[in-house]
Amino acid sequence: MDRNAKVLVVDDDENIRNTMKAILEDEGYIVDLAATGREAVEKTQKAAYNIALLDIRLPDMEGIELLKLMKDATPRTRKIMVTGYPSMQSAITALNKNADAYLVKPVNIEKLLITVKEQLQLQEEERQFSEQKVAEFIETRVKELSTPF
C-alpha cells in the first residue's frame, strides 16, 4: 500500500528537511522537498503526493495558510502539520483547518513513521470507499435503466 508513496516535506530548515528525507527514503518512500510555502504549492501543481509534512512557520506564509491552499488544490493529499512551537491552540487551529495529523519538533522518528503509515492507511481506506460508492452508483443506475417502465 505505501510502497512508492510520495511524500512532500515542507520546512525552511534544511537540516530538518534532509533528515526527514533520509528517514522516509530508508522506509521506501519517494520524498520531495520544499523550503517555502510557495515552492510547496508549485510542486503540488506539478506532482501528486500522498503525504505532505508541513512546517507551521515558513518564511513566506504560515503553515495554516499553506494547509488551506493545499486542501483546496490537493484534497486527497494527507497533510501532517509539524511544529517547533507547540500549543494547544495551534494544534486545534491546524486540525480545524483540516490537518490530518499534528507532530511536535523535535520529531520522534518512530512517531513520524507511525503517523505516516496511519495516514497512508486512512488514504487507502478513503480511496476504497470512494471506489465502492462509485460501483454501487453504477450498479443502481444500470438496474434503473434496465427496468422497463
Sequence positions of predicted segments:
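CheY-like receiver
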Residues: 122-149
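Short hydrophobic/Thr-rich beta-strand motif most characteristic of the beta2 strand and flanking loop
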Residues: 28-35, 43
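Short amphipathic alpha-helix used as the core "switch/output" element in two-component signaling
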Residues: 42, 64-76
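C-terminal output helix
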Residues: 107-116
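Acidic catalytic/metal-coordinating carboxylates
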Residues: 5, 36, 62-65, 83
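The feature encodes the CheY-like receiver
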Residues: 17, 59, 83
